[in-house]
Amino acid sequence: MRLLGELEGWALKHGIREIRTNADWRNHRMLHFFDRTGFELGRNHVIDCAVHGGQIIEGEDDKIFAPEHHRATAELDYGAPAANDFETLARDRSDVRSLAPEDLADLARIDHRITGRDRSEYITRLVDEAMRDSAIRVSLAAHLGGSVAGFVMAKVDIGDFGRIEPVAVIDTIGVDPGFAAAGIGTALLSQLFVNLEALHIERVETVVSRENFELLGFFYRAGFGPSRRLAFVKRIA
């Protein structure tokens, strides 16, 4: 309780008006704690997908952008020959490679085209964290026609939110509307799954607003479904 109070005080000093988290619905002690401390069910859905044996279903991409709820991280060499359908699909669609600092301007441009807002500071912070925070970077950019056509920013969580098993969390995924029908989002997820398999990560999850039907539909077509985890929010005055 005291720690939560300290967190709320810090949040208020920094202009933050709500605290978000999530928990397994079977963790009754944690749910009881959230109930006693004023948390409510959030308006977001936590969805996930098994990496091993998962299936990326091909289809046209639209304006997709995941919410800003985590941070990003990690990097692999994709030079090895294609070993499965995910990798073949990813390479056939576009040139998908590790996110690099020089991609920042393109990421901010794509985000602005999708959201209609200037979130360059937020994107800069995510890219900076992706470059420095972890030895395992799984954030990717898709290049097509000489420019960045889309990106996915993800991290590997070990122990966050009370978990004991490692899981990959997608922070943000965005596709330039000019490449909406080029399968960029599918290619990004395909390569992400390849990389996670190499890291022996068995699940990937993300959080999506329940009103974002386009993004939910995209993830559901890619094999995602409802998670055992529920999103909670506490609004602070």
Task: Show which residues each predicted segment covers.
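Short glycine-/small-residue motifs
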Residues: N44, G150-F151, R229
